[in-house]
């Protein structure tokens, strides 16, 4: 992995801030960063949690649930931009498919215990600023910029194992 020197980070952050002011910027969020969050779910009745990025904005969470015996499950979400006016940069994960049928509630409950997740009905709203902050160039963005940033589009790149999040400034 290439390392950027501090002055390169500042230049990169400045370029991104300028692109946000002008229009929008696409930020890749690696599958492994998202997987670290999901596998950290604090629920002893879940184990072997994995996250996989798939075609068409789909994110698949799978693992095992303790129901007397350990039962394998898989839950597929479609990642989309949140409705206009949603505070902060976030992505909505709409429930698409579950196997077995009873898997959705316990997966949503486990996700809802995480600080960056909010459960609304059968979908999860995920704050992505946490993942973006982990990227080196984000340190050099002007203070308070993330308060005005909104997600305008979401897609996936399964080949590179990334969630592609397009950011723009609110009202701009």
Model-derived regions: residue spans:
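Extracellular/lumenal and peripheral-membrane lipid-interaction modules
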Residues: 1-172
